Amino acid sequence: MPLEMSRGRETILLVEDEPDIRDFVGEVLQDQGYTVLEARDGEDALRVVEQYREPLHLVLTDVAMPKLGGRDLVARLLAQHPHLNVLYMSGYTDDALGARSVLEAGATLLAKPFTPRQLVSTVRQVLDAPASDELLRVP
């Protein structure tokens, strides 16, 4: 069922360790016209980015993953791509937004579960907002 929203042309790096969620998110975004590069964890994402030669516009990553989590992945990616837009997703919203936050101030978090419409709308909002390199300064 196609969503009636503005179609995307950007490239998104999707990093999610749960195959069913990765497949769902990838399909929704591809149906909206985005180019989607998929990775199963942070280490896999770094390999994908190293091999991809075109511009990358957004990293959409799970927060908690084995090997290399979302925040550490984002820090590494922003070191080489400081204008990359970032969108986190997590089923652990209370933990991720707690007093001793796992995420940096101002980070956009999409809480699981989400609908296709919520996904597409949030992705578009993050892509349309100016990217920030503030994440590089987070200890």
Question: How does the language model describe each region?
Answer:
Residues 65:
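Receiver (REC) domain active-site loop signature in two-component systems and cognate sites
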Residues 41-44, 68-73:
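Acidic catalytic/metal-coordinating carboxylates
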Residues 62:
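Active-site residues of response regulator receiver
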Residues 72, 76-79, 83-111, 117-124:
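Alpha4 helix (beta4-alpha4-beta5 surface) of REC/receiver domains from two-component response regulators
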Residues 23-31:
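Charged docking surfaces used in two-component/phosphorelay signaling
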Residues 13, 26, 38-58:
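Acidic, metal-coordinating helix/loop segments flanking the phosphotransfer/catalytic sites
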Residues 1-11, 100:
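Disordered, acidic interdomain junction associated with two-component signaling
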Residues 16:
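Conserved acidic carboxylate
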